[in-house]
């Protein structure tokens, strides 16, 4: 989660109680390492770790953005599956806009993706999300 969210009054304070892994998106390598190290620790403590591989919402017409490899590396290192989740919130909650449009956000949860190759895990998750995204938009 981008660390800027944690300083939003009330909302950020409440979210911080969930022990999120906050990252500085300007420091990409440091942030990736933090997700891998802190995410691995959380998994070993019994927590589920939610990774947003694109890093931001997009408009449906912009399609799926570039995926970071953190989800594949984390799943491979910790020998846990990736549970892909796809949603269309970008259709109503436009990025960099205060305005939120009303509508139903669809969320689809896929089957576990299991493997040991981080790149293949990431690509399989991306492929499923891309296909599902086109179906729900």
Q: Model-derived features: where do they sit?
A:
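Non-catalytic C-terminal accessory region of glycerolipid acyltransferases
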Residues: 33-137
